[in-house]
Amino acid sequence: MAATMFRATLRGWRTGVQRGCGLRLLSHTQGPPDYPSFVESVDEYQFVERLLPATRIPDPPKHEHYPTPSGWQPPRDPPPNLPYFVRRSRMHNIPVYKDITHGNRQMTVIRKVEGDIWALQKDVEDFLSPLLGKTPVTQVNEVTGTLRIKGYFDQELKAWLLEKGF
């Protein structure tokens, strides 16, 4: 009997919980404690709204003359009447990017192409052929709406798309 009591005492000592003390205290509690009431203030919510991120990127401000000092230019107001359309990125830039794969394969990617992407490929090939002296190697992905061109032509293609009105 003494050994059993000694083991029970050690068990309580190891876990830090004495036998039977938790149930007795829980049964004698009253209802929920009375907390002080609160006042809902909508005047200070403007400070919270400043911390919340914007749900969409605002439209760029109107400028007196274009291109702006950063080089940004808005798209032409009536969009060009072409069988394809190149939508701007969410930051209102032309979606033409450089891409490098396998360590040395340099590609230019035109994203967000809607409509007849094959007509865009033909126009890009017609535009780049005099610059290269040969027809550039291109890859069309109709599902994602991207056109990949072998080589770095991002600045030339951005200027060409701006000239077309995108």
UniProtKB/Swiss-Prot annotation:
Q: Which family does it belong to?
A: Belongs to the mitochondrion-specific ribosomal protein mL49 family.
Q: What is this protein called?
A: Large ribosomal subunit protein mL49
Q: Name one Pfam family in it.
A: Img2
What are the transmembrane regions? none
Task: Report keywords, A-Z.
Answer: Mitochondrion, Ribonucleoprotein, Ribosomal protein
Give the record's GO CC terms: mitochondrial large ribosomal subunit; mitochondrial ribosome
**Region spans: Disordered:** 56-78
Q: What is the lineage of its organism?
A: Eukaryota, Metazoa, Chordata, Craniata, Vertebrata
Q: Which PANTHER family match?
A: LARGE RIBOSOMAL SUBUNIT PROTEIN ML49, MITOCHONDRIAL 39S RIBOSOMAL PROTEIN L49
Instruction: Note whether Mitochondrion occurs among the keywords.
Output: yes
Q: Name one GO biological process term.
A: translation
Assembly, in brief, is: Component of the mitochondrial ribosome large subunit (39S) which comprises a 16S rRNA and about 50 distinct proteins. Interacts with OXA1L.
Q: Which organism is it from?
A: Pongo abelii
Taxonomically, which superkingdom? Eukaryota
Subcellular localization is given as: Mitochondrion
Q: Name one GO molecular function term.
A: structural constituent of ribosome
Q: Which InterPro entries match?
A: Ribosomal_mL49
